[in-house]
Amino acid sequence: MKKSKNVCVAVVSLCLFGTQLFSQEKAQEKKMEQLEEIVIYATKFELKKENTGKVIYKISQKDIQRNAGKSVIELLNNVLGIEIRGVNSNPGEPRSTYIRGGRSRQALVLIDGIPLSDPTGIEQSYDLRLISLNQIESIEILKGASSTLYGSGAGTGVINIILKKASENTVSGVYEVSLGTNATSKNSTSSLNDKNQNISINGTLDKLKYNAFFNITGNSGFSSAKSTLTIPFEEDTYSSNNGFLKLGYEFNTQLRMDAFLNYDEFDYTFDAGAYNDSDVNLGNQEQFRIGIRPRLKYKKGEVFLNASINSLDRSFESFNSFSGGTNVFIYKGTSVNLDFVNKYEFTKNFQLITGINYQKHENESISDFGNIDPDLANFNVVDPYVSAVYITDFGLSINAGSRLNIHSNYGNNFVYDTNLAFGIVKNETITLKLISSYSTAFIAPSLYQLFSDYGATNLAPETNRTFEFGFDSKLGKQWALSAVYYNRLEENKVIFQNLPTPPYGMYANALETIDVSGIEADVTFTISEELITTVGYAFVDKTSDIDYIPKNKLTASFVVNPIKNLAISTMFKNVGKRSFFDAFGSFGEAGKDVILPSYSLLDMNVNYKVLEGKVLFFGSITNLLNEEYEETIGFNTRGRNFKMGIRIQF
């Protein structure tokens, strides 16, 4: 403990040291960023953040570079109002994304504006392990129900991942390699079991832009399941490959065509369950995406088409304790997405966005417990939608829209939203903006929930409603404050009901309405342009379905540049108590909640640039205080680990 306190003192001292330093160049850089800040996909088109009444958080390229060596889910877990269950578990274990107390099925993932899902999954939610952080330029998180523009799954929020663009040079490239430890708090090791390398080649040849990327990751070091014995279980492994090719051609200033080809794959071993080892379970997942995006600008607006096909194959083998053999599961799914969008500007203050979205999903499953025929397990949707944006000259911005969801299985469903932003004060001394929104959303039943042996073809979509109200404010050049209150209602949730006769269970819509209220607040204090600290707090109060959702989460970050080209950042998180309903008494008394205690994590990142920024050395320490805790009952989490790497631009 004394050693841990000394480490904390050292970190704080380092931050205070940075308060004595100041860089005019950095100050000008930051000021320009604030002036030019835009939200790229809040309305599917560029829009200044001050003109939207939605809560939006952006992870910039600077944030990504500052956290070199991390994964997408590790960065998202630092965002206020987001909790990723399993983020610090063995990489082979599935992750769950909770936004404002919701579940993964209620958080829609986009890549360059294209919605992604897993048609083979029980809830059809996308696996964020399939994308490498090194591919990404920035990430935007749009909070609240957002189905009007984005369709099914946008119940609690939208995570829009924007991939890197090509350099204006003829040829540019980046090569990065990193090595790190991977161990639990009880079984520390100096072995370098966390390995990654990636390379990117991009550039511009006349009117053609190109960007090619390839990434390899390997990970081992500890078992997924937690051992109750003094001897740990055998190690579980994880390896992944990611590659993409992106091309863009500008015919003229009005017409542009983009195309992409993307392949992601990972292999993993996994255990038999909580506190239960296995040396035979293994899995594989592959994703192949291809798409085009023609875009035309005209005098009063622009129009584009997003057309993509996503093919996903999953398979795994698991030990069957009853038969003494292994069960094999094979899942194959395909999703087709066509989104035709037009923006027309009637005046500089008023624009109308119209679109029509077509999607088709199908699933084929082969297993010892029954098959799913793709000729049966498929559905399609045709959704027309409209959204209007009006920006007044006195600081008020209004955004309102609606969508008609036409589903081949359950019929029609209507959603709508409206949001307001009102800039009360805006000058060099103080800015104050009020925001408010009321929006609805839907989550369509998955192919598995509809067409498996446990499925019910009469399922209705889950509906979500969000109301939120808050403010953004800046006081001088040092203080920035924001806070928002939200209330969500969930109805028609798809649940699994046990039955006394075969097949002993079936999916159905719940009669219960789930009420969720919460507060998100953060404050940023710019002590100097070289030392910035941000403290955030999220509170979630949910009436039911609360497994693993913390009621309280506190975050604090410190960013310091003590000397030129050196950046040091720390991130502190305190995750409050969580509960798990133990229906069968597996971990205690049947029918009672198991309480997981709160825990705190402190991470540190260091970056140093040389050769005019062409070479970047980076390092990190995660869980610096080596805290032992459980994210999921019966499974290990990472202890104190170290990583170091180098990035070379050419």
For the regions a language model picked out, list residue spans one by one.
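Short acidic/polar hinge/loop motifs at secondary-structure boundaries
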Residues: P115-K143
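Conserved C-terminal beta-signal and adjacent last beta-strands/turns
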Residues: C8-V12, S23, N90, N202-L205, ...
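Extracytoplasmic beta-strand/coil segments of soluble accessory domains associated
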Residues: I73, N77-P115
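Structural signature of Gram-negative outer-membrane beta-barrels, strongest in the C-terminal barrel
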Residues: N252, T347-I353, N357-N363, F369-E490, ...
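Gram-negative outer-membrane beta-barrel transporters
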Residues: E176, I391-I398, Y485-L489, N509-A583, ...
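Outer-membrane beta-barrel signature, preferentially recognizing the C-terminal barrel domain
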Residues: N276-K297, Y331, K433, S437-E491, ...
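N-terminal periplasmic accessory domains that precede
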Residues: E37, V72-L75, R95-Y98, A107-L110, ...
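Flexible loop and strand-edge segments within Gram-negative outer membrane beta-barrel domains
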Residues: E25, N219-A225, L229-F244, G248-S335
